[in-house]
Curated annotation (Swiss-Prot):
Family designation: Belongs to the ketol-acid reductoisomerase family.
Cofactor binding summary note: Binds 2 magnesium ions per subunit.
Keyword entries, A-Z: Amino-acid biosynthesis, Branched-chain amino acid biosynthesis, Magnesium, Metal-binding, NADP, Oxidoreductase, Repeat
Cofactor(s) the protein requires to work: Mg(2+)
Entry protein name: Ketol-acid reductoisomerase (NADP(+))
GO molecular function: ketol-acid reductoisomerase activity; magnesium ion binding
InterPro entries the UniProt entry points to: 6-PGluconate_DH-like_C_sf, 6PGD_dom2, KARI, KARI_C, KARI_N, NAD(P)-bd_dom_sf
SUPFAM superfamilies membership: 6-phosphogluconate dehydrogenase C-terminal domain-like, NAD(P)-binding Rossmann-fold domains
Reaction catalysed by this enzyme: (2R)-2,3-dihydroxy-3-methylbutanoate + NADP(+) = (2S)-2-acetolactate + NADPH + H(+); (2R,3R)-2,3-dihydroxy-3-methylpentanoate + NADP(+) = (S)-2-ethyl-2-hydroxy-3-oxobutanoate + NADPH + H(+)
One GO term (biological process): L-valine biosynthetic process
Positions with a binding annotation for Mg(2+) 2: 217, 389, 393
Active site residues according to the UniProt entry: 132
Amino acid sequence: MANYFNTLNLRQQLAQLGKCRFMAREEFVDETGYLKGKKVVIVGCGAQGLNQGLNMRDSGLDIAYALRKEAIEEKRASWRKATENGFQVGTYEELIPQADLVINLTPDKQHSSVVSAVQPLMKEGAALGYSHGLNIVEVGEQIRKDITVVMVAPKCPGTEVREEYKRGFGVPTLIAVHPENDPKGEGMAIAKAWAAATGAHRAGVLESSFVAEVKSDLMGEQTILCGMLQAGSLLCYDKLVADGAEPGYAGKLIQFGWETITEALKQGGITLMMDRLSNPAKLRAYALSEQLKEMMTPLFQKHMDDIISGEFSSGMMADWANDDKKLLGWREETGNTSFENSPEYDGKISEQEYFDHGVLMVAMVKAGVELAFEIMVDTGIIAESAYYESLHELPLIANTISRKRLYEMNVVISDTAEYGNYLFSHVAVPLLKEKFMGSLQAGDLGKPVVDNGIDNAQLRDVNEAIRHHPIEVVGRVLRGYMTDMKRIAVGG
């Protein structure tokens, strides 16, 4: 199999990278109608598999779970989750032949083996669904020409898919049809019905492409969503302790600080996040973020370049073939860091203190979000898609750190995201340690900014620059479709 993206000519690559359209709510008047009365079989019962299935069943669809024979016989976690929630469970051979739609929600590294097992069992004219297109785009999986291939990709972890549905809402979602596999022209109808069954149509749906979803998703998770949070956590913790902060306080400020800071980001973008700072602190955070952007642009560009060329995926798949030797080694290294092993802190940190004592963290968030967005757009990815893959998902990932630090983040995200996270942070940490962290001044981290001198013209210009950045312009529009977003952050 060959990387699908690399088989396209330049015009085709640009067309698929740039495919992104915000769908009107009127396009979902039929909601789940196209799949009513049809058999939907989900392969895999992890976070996405279980929670999407629960939503789809509650939306009136016929859902069953196909699991490997060994998983059923040994009553593994996937079998227990499916049966405890009252779903029909069977082997591939029992359930796949009767399915109108087979949804593959197993981890990326299992996709090829799963598809090779289920494809011969699928009836003629059935549909195959994904929630991430890496198997199609990067691996280059070849699907039978009579099979329709679609994607519904929620822009959040599976648990959030379920929680928002229970609230009568949903999560923003990308949908797509693989242009090589839409023999009956029904792919979009299938994808729309599946998305509606998860509740996505109530939060906003983007019609995209497999290519755009994969390339933007990889870029977001490697840089701002996971890589920058990991690098920032390690750097900021070490800096706080080196400056005399109590290790427990330093750990808590970082662990809960990302979540608290990005909650403002979720509700009002970079503008609101920066507005939570005093004016002197805002000016300082802006200056720091500009320094970070200049310093880190080549690193962000390299990640985007390696994603576009397929270099990233080929390296990761080589590690799959080597039993995840690199991934598991990097995971162990992270578990041994000072931040991960910092003591608990019983003291109270107020919500505002996370901002006042975390000016550098705010600057890191601003720089990372803007850089990821800018480079995706420069590469041909449409602004709406770049927004969802940078700013929108960040509070959800930050929330995982608040639970069990970096360990929890790396458990919740996919192995693909975790592998890319380590590639980024392993370069970012020494780069910033050598060229940036030593230039910090009092008030950047762990203490409030004390300089109260304000230049009105400078403040005016900074506010204008923040509010008119392209990610803020598109973000205001997209957040208008998500007026019922619940508050995540609780602080500590």
